[in-house]
Every structure is written in C-alpha cells, then in structure tokens.
C-alpha cells in the first residue's frame, strides 16, 4: 500500500511517517517547504510539493496513492484564517482524492467535538467530519484530546528555565496521549476493515489537570515551578480583543479553548473496545509519567555532561 501523509513535518505527522515506513509502506509527504521537510526524504519518504491554503498546488497525479492520512492543521502564525486550511483546503484534498480514485482517508478531530462546537476551531473539525460522512470515501476519524509533546513547552521547559507558568486554576482534566501511540493506531487502521466509516476516540491512560502535571514535572526535575494563576475572565477578554484584528484571529480562536478548562467536564473516553479492535493492550501505550521521566532524564544528563565539560576546561 502506498500512503500520502499531509502535515508530515508536524508533531504528529512525522511520527505517522516514521511508523508507516517502519511497517513497510511506501510513503509520500505533501509539504509546502521542501527544504524544511528534507529530513523526511532522508528517512525514505518521497516529497511532493503542495499547500492546502492554495488548492491549485495540490498534485493532480495521485493515482499511485492508495490511502491518505491527514495530520495537517493551521498554525497560529499563519497569515490567514484557520478555515482556509482546516476546511477549504481539506475539502479540496478530498476532491483530489476522489479524482485519483483514492478511497481510504484518515482524519483527526477533537474528542467530544460536538460538545464544543461553539469554539471556532472545533466547529471546523465538526464540519469536516460531517463532510467526510457524506462523501464516498472510506474514512476513519480519530478524535483526540491532546499530545504529550505539547506539555513539554507548556510545563517542562518553563520549569527547567525557571520561567513563569500561567494557569487559570481550571477544574477540567484532559487525557493526553503520545503522538507515537496515535501513529500506531492510525497506521494500523489502514489494515482493519472495521474502522471504515467509523469515528474512534483515542486517548491515553490517565487524565490530568495543570496542577497535577506541574507536580509531576517538579518531582522529576527536582525544581520548583513558578506558577501564576490568572482569572479565566482575563483570557476571555484577550480572546475578544484579539478577535478584532484579522492578523490575530488564529490566536483568538486558540484562546477560546481556555473556556473549556473551566467546564468541570473531563476530556476523556473509554478505550477498552478500541484496544480490542486494534489488537493493543494498555501496556502498549506510553504513560505520561514514563514519557516525562524519559524527557527529564535525557535533559538532566545532558546538563550534567555540559557542567562536567566546563569544569574540565577551567
């Protein structure tokens, strides 16, 4: 089977590429910056130029592709509204897949998306889910909650660098998952007929709130976090303020997620049936504790090595 990965240079996309290559798939990657994506070519993937914000750049000759995994999303820094990528670009991609005769399509959405449809970014995910459901494609939609990898910049690095961590004192717990594990499920789904035209929740082993994650990072790093709590109302104010300017629209839409954290409704799902369907066990899934332990272990070892090198040069 030959696979086309969209968003292949991103946090999730690159793990999907690596996993698919390891399992023997022929992998092509649709990228908008060939130079930045060169590492994917070194891994063994083929690079194709294309930009979802410019549908006319999508390749017209995709006949050798048998499946598409779309891990793309708009960035906060993009100079256009998220809809240009997360809806219009994806619809153009699906239409290109139909023309090429590609049936299999894997998409990533947000867990319990219908509950948060008032949020602009989630609404785009809902609309894309609905579009796929009315299409002729053999789609699989994975609904995700959050990535371990995003917690590094949010909590781990600020603690190590003694920077302030801003939290809202939220009540909601989120069941984060490692992108490596998401990649395992995504690639496995291509060989399971039972996943066709299905929406599947995909979460980790345990739900966490911000304070619990900070406590874990403090214990593993041996350092105390500098925490500042800010009222949720202040973030809501910034959301509306940034919404006034076109160049801050994406930032405003992401600030809207802060309102979810005070909803007192945990973002999680039961996974037993999913494990059974995919042939995985809970032991096959990485826990946040082991992920963070590995991260801090590597960083602290490196810091010790640098300290030893400085002492030897004195």
Swiss-Prot record:
<keyword id="KW-0934">Plastid</keyword>
<dbReference type="GO" id="GO:0016491">
    <property type="term" value="F:oxidoreductase activity"/>
</dbReference>
<dbReference type="InterPro" id="IPR044256">
    <property type="entry name" value="HCF244-like"/>
</dbReference>
<protein>
    <recommendedName>
        <fullName>Photosystem II assembly factor Ycf39</fullName>
        <ecNumber>1.-.-.-</ecNumber>
    </recommendedName>
</protein>
<keyword id="KW-0150">Chloroplast</keyword>
<keyword id="KW-0604">Photosystem II</keyword>
<dbReference type="GO" id="GO:0009523">
    <property type="term" value="C:photosystem II"/>
</dbReference>
<comment type="similarity">
    <text>Belongs to the NmrA-type oxidoreductase family. Ycf39 subfamily.</text>
</comment>
<dbReference type="InterPro" id="IPR036291">
    <property type="entry name" value="NAD(P)-bd_dom_sf"/>
</dbReference>
<comment type="function">
    <text>Involved in assembly of photosystem II.</text>
</comment>
<dbReference type="GO" id="GO:0015979">
    <property type="term" value="P:photosynthesis"/>
</dbReference>
<keyword id="KW-0602">Photosynthesis</keyword>
<dbReference type="GO" id="GO:0009507">
    <property type="term" value="C:chloroplast"/>
</dbReference>
<dbReference type="Pfam" id="PF05368">
    <property type="entry name" value="NmrA"/>
</dbReference>
<dbReference type="InterPro" id="IPR008030">
    <property type="entry name" value="NmrA-like"/>
</dbReference>
<keyword id="KW-0560">Oxidoreductase</keyword>
């Amino acid at each position: 089977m030959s696979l086309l990965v969209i968003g292949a240079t991103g946090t999730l996309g690159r793990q999907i590429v690596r996993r698919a290559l390891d399992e023997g798939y022929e992998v092509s990657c649709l990228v908008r910056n060939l130079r930045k994506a060169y590492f994917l070519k070194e891994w063994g993937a083929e690079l194709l130029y294309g930009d979802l914000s410019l549908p006319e750049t999508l390749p017209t000759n995709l006949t050798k592709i048998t499946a598409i995994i779309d891990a793309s999303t708009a960035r906060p820094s993009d100079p256009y509204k998220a809809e240009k990528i997360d809806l219009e670009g994806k619809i153009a991609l699906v239409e290109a897949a139909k023309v090429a005769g590609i049936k299999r399509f894997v998409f990533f959405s947000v867990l319990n998306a219908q509950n948060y449809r008032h949020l602009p970014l989630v609404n785009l995910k809902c609309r894309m889910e609905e579009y796929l459901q009315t299409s002729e494609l053999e789609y699989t939609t994975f609904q995700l909650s959050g990535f371990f990898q995003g917690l590094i910049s949010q909590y781990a690095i600020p603690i190590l660098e003694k920077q302030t961590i801003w939290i809202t004192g939220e009540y909601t717990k989120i069941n984060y998952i490692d992108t490596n594990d998401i990649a395992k499920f995504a690639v496995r789904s291509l060989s399971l007929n039972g996943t066709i035209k299905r929406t599947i929740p995909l979460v980790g082993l345990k739900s966490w709130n911000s304070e619990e994650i900070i406590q874990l990072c403090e214990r593993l790093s041996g350092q105390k976090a500098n925490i500042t709590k800010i009222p949720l109302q202040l973030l809501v104010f910034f959301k509306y303020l940034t919404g006034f300017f076109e160049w801050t629209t994406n930032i405003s839409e992401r600030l809207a997620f802060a309102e979810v954290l005070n909803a007192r409704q945990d973002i999680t799902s039961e996974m037993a049936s999913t494990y059974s369907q995919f042939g995985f066990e809970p032991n096959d899934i990485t826990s946040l504790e082991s992920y963070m332990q590995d991260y801090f272990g590597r960083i602290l070892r490196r810091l010790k090595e640098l300290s030893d090198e400085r002492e030897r040069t004195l």
